[in-house]
Design a protein with these regions (language model features):
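Short helix-coil boundary/hinge micro-motifs
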Residues: 1-113, 117-124
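BZIP DNA-binding basic region
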Residues: 94-95, 106-150, 154-156
Length: 156
């Protein structure tokens, strides 16, 4: 049976985290239209916009290794014959459910924020040893390596 339920995996979580674009100073959840648009593009109901922002900011902090508290709310459970699924309907519920699913699978640590100081884009680290630091080695990795090189040259 095919449902319209969102895929509660890394892609959804990364997309939700990236509703805040640090480099371009764009927050897709800053207004109701952007929030509705993002939720609709992912097959979700928008829910409360401010709650979605709080959830996003808390999840970004958690992913970045900071101590953060998620707002209290319940993600509905949808029992069906032969399965029990998380019935996330809103953007915030789906993001939290995705994080929980990934954590249960031991994969939440693979969701990271780019080490580029001016980027901070979320990405899923699919490398074999989980050591990727940047969303893109070609862009952010090279920028950071160039900064490090220039700083070392100035010191010597």
């Amino acid at each position: 049976m095919r449902t319209n339920a969102p895929d509660l995996g890394a892609d959804l979580l990364v997309a939700f985290l990236n509703t805040l674009d640090v480099e371009d100073d764009v927050d897709q959840l800053a207004d109701d239209d952007g929030h509705r648009r993002w939720a609709g593009e992912h097959g979700l109901q928008p829910g409360d916009r401010e709650e979605a922002q709080r959830v996003r900011d808390a999840l970004r902090a958690i992913i970045d290794g900071e101590d953060a508290r998620l707002p209290d709310f319940a993600v509905p459970i949808d029992p069906r014959p032969g399965s029990v699924t998380l019935g996330a309907r809103t953007a915030a519920e789906a993001a939290v459910a995705s994080a929980v699913v990934l954590d249960i699978q031991g994969k939440l640590g693979r969701v990271k924020l780019c080490g580029g100081e001016d980027c901070r884009w979320a990405f899923y680290d699919a490398s074999r040893n989980g050591s990727r630091q940047w969303c893109s080695m070609e862009v952010c990795g090279n920028r950071q390596k160039a900064r490090t090189f220039r700083a070392k040259e100035r010191e010597s």
